[in-house]
């Protein structure tokens, strides 16, 4: 390379040195040792490019996680005023998707060589006897896909170039100790501490054992199950057991047993009730009919889910006195004024389906600033789901993919939001106006601003909510648990003497009465449910909503598949009846 002093075209600008990120014991000491080695080479050898390489993994050598290595070295080089002298390149097998690349760049990496990802592409295609040119094309396509994902991540934050995104630290860090945050991710937001260096090293040792010693695993590489449930892999709350329990609505006590028996998978699972009050008769507790009024269906558009599912939810919610939500896809005017009418009409950045008649048919108008399933992005409906009817409802063209802009282009300040709230109240003076926010660190400040803009209700949407149309890259690593955002918003509103002005709602993964009660104790006054309702209507959690191939007719516009829809209004009502009774008990 041009950085090799023995090369004919040597240029000191490219002078580089490779540093292994392997270690034997003591993660923290190894990080500091690696940093000192890097710093000495920069100061003494005048290198311009630092290559952090994790290809030296062996039976005796473990690897420092690349985000820790990048973050630690980048941060300490800046502290010692030598960061500007070098570029940091990560030669790593840890980057396999846009998120993992974004983490390294945001915490200081200048460039990334994801060798394992490229090797996987070659390995996957070598059996097809492709020409060298075709194989190179596959690798380039992979690179284009990762770059496209990076651009989407940057666009969510309003950033146009990688140079601006680098060193931005635009992440909320959940579950790492204050010491690690201070050492490696100083500028990142962190509200919930957790693993220390010793804890991470134990996990590294376990993975190392599985790779080099444990011969009882079924596959050479663990499948993981990040997006889809795999037995023994990543935990999914809507796994087979809970999905089956929800489907058996006549015995929802089984669902309650599963939820309460899970091993602390969510923040709320760490909360135990503490009270010195004596039990009271259930006859003295708020009635089911009153509790029903606090229940809402989460926003799911007629388009992301089928007409049959959308109408069943609306009828069920209207029957019990709750509220269904149209989502951002408009609604058939023939449903207005009937049991099929959604009390909540959503107004999103794309304004799909928004007409004066649509707005005046609502009891509540919901401005979607963000949603838990894919915060920072607008709604997305693949063209395959936009049939003639959906196109008519949304006033668009059949077969064309519909993507709402990430921001509302008429909202760039609290004053702009106040203007939209005012305009909506002029169209429908009887409706309450709500603003939907996503749970994130700092949402409390935003909630206070929304209250000052005269919104009637604020919704805190958690990351555990589902989605009927989002691509896979939007499902993971976006948004925080509603528990964090709800507590922050509630406390911020109280601190600013605004809490009594607004109603607060929580949504995102609520399933049982204990979830509702814990949300209430954190400040929520009403509660929205999405995925459980679709599961009751027949959803099998296949995670193919975006393909328009839902085999049970819940999340598809394919007429043949919609004929297989077997959900009923009665089953939904049974679920909410169980839920309200569970809350009372």
Predicted features, each with a name:
Residues 1-28, 37-41, 47-49, 100-101, ...:
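Flexible, glycine-rich loop/tail regions that form catalytic "lids" or insertion modules at the edges
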Residues 4-28, 76-79, 288-290, 296-297, ...:
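N-terminal small/glycine-rich loop or linker at the start of catalytic domains
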Residues 16-147, 153-162, 172, 177, ...:
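Glycine-rich phosphate/ribose-binding loops and adjacent secondary-structure elements
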Residues 326, 343-344, 378, 414, ...:
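Iron-sulfur-associated redox domains of electron-transfer enzymes in respiratory
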Residues 378-380, 540:
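Short conserved micro-motifs at the rims of enzyme active sites and ligand-binding pockets
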Residues 401-407, 564-566:
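Short glycine/proline- and acidic residue-enriched helix-loop micro-motifs
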Residues 561-581:
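Anionic ligand-binding catalytic core segments
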